[in-house]
Design a protein with these regions (language model features):
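Mixed-charge interfacial surface used for oligomerization/domain docking
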Residues: 4, 10-24, 29-31, 78, ...
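N-terminal glycine-rich anion-binding loop in soluble enzyme alpha/beta folds
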Residues: 3-65, 69
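Short gly/ser-rich anion-binding loops that grip negatively charged ligand groups
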Residues: 53-60, 81-92, 113-117, 130
Length: 280
């Protein structure tokens, strides 16, 4: 058997990748009125401009069910669970409670990805690749932690109000992002969203996003992910510029944000994740 990797649906990994590497996925929830929709399981149409649409983490019971299934599938080799930043979601805390309830602290290792979207997904992918090569529980855990701590994430949003309302961004940062600039460039720092810099035009914002990603990538090759919501053309342009400026690029993924993150980021959001050294 082999170590099994678990992540949550906000990680945004393609279904084909999840299936190929045997990654287990815990669905998070989008709340539309009185209806709770499981991300990635049930189809959903969302008005991302609505103030009434919210999200919620999986419960400890839901997490425990997935962890127990993964542990059985591992044949006792263990589970590494890589989840969205605990600063942005209650998912990691639900996972910790599930592990306590299972009394399985030695067999189920939790990793705070310090990120969201593919900033969670690529560390989970790094762990799953290591598991597929026969890695031990410690080695698979270390692969996830290494990728997560190296990762650098930069996000452009049209509005910061949704992030502030959901508690994902400070009131001060939200003010500077919404009142004084056209396109705020945010970054994840130790799992928290912070305002990195300000751009008054869309073109300057894209240029600064690319520059930040290139600087973070370094010269030794990197894994890069570009994510967006309703900004496919801009995402492809940014991806093309990154290909040109990072000739040693090891991996490049372009994908759309899933519903849980999209609720908070809003239409037009565009993000770049960089993992220096890659996530093999």
């Amino acid at each position: 058997m082999a170590v099994v990797v678990v992540t949550d649906s906000s990680a945004g990994l393609p279904t084909a990748t999840v299936d190929e590497l045997g990654i287990a996925v815990v669905p998070l929830h989008v709340l539309v009125g009185d209806r709770a929709i499981r991300e990635g399981v049930e189809p959903v149409e969302i008005d991302y401009t609505s103030d009434t649409v919210t999200t919620s983490a999986a419960s400890p019971g839901e997490m425990r069910e997935i962890y127990e299934q993964a542990l059985r599938r591992s044949g006792g080799d263990g589970v590494v669970a890589v989840h969205v930043s605990r600063q942005l979601s209650g998912t990691w805390e639900s996972g910790r409670q599930a592990v306590r309830d299972m009394d399985a602290g030695r067999q189920v290792r939790l990793v705070d990805s310090l990120g969201a979207g593919l900033a969670t997904g690529l560390p989970a992918l790094a762990a799953a690749r290591r598991a597929a090569r026969g890695g031990t529980l410690d080695e698979v855990y270390d692969a996830a932690v290494t990728a997560a701590t190296r990762a650098r994430t930069f996000i452009l949003v049209n509005r910061t109000e949704q992030l502030r309302r959901g508690g994902r961004l400070s009131t001060a940062a939200s003010f500077f992002g919404s009142e004084l600039v056209t396109r705020p460039l945010l970054q994840l720092v130790e799992g928290k969203l912070e305002l990195r810099e300000k751009a008054r035009t869309r073109s300057k914002a894209y240029a600064r996003l690319v520059a930040a990603a290139v600087e973070a990538a370094g010269a030794d090759g990197a894994a890069v992910a570009v994510q967006h919501l309703g900004a496919a053309e801009a995402a492809e342009i940014v991806a093309g510029q990154l290909r040109e400026r990072l000739p040693e690029l090891k991996e490049l993924v372009v994908a759309e944000f899933g519903p849980v993150l999209a609720v908070h980021l809003g239409v037009g959001a565009l993000g770049v994740l960089v993992i220096p050294g890659g996530c093999d």
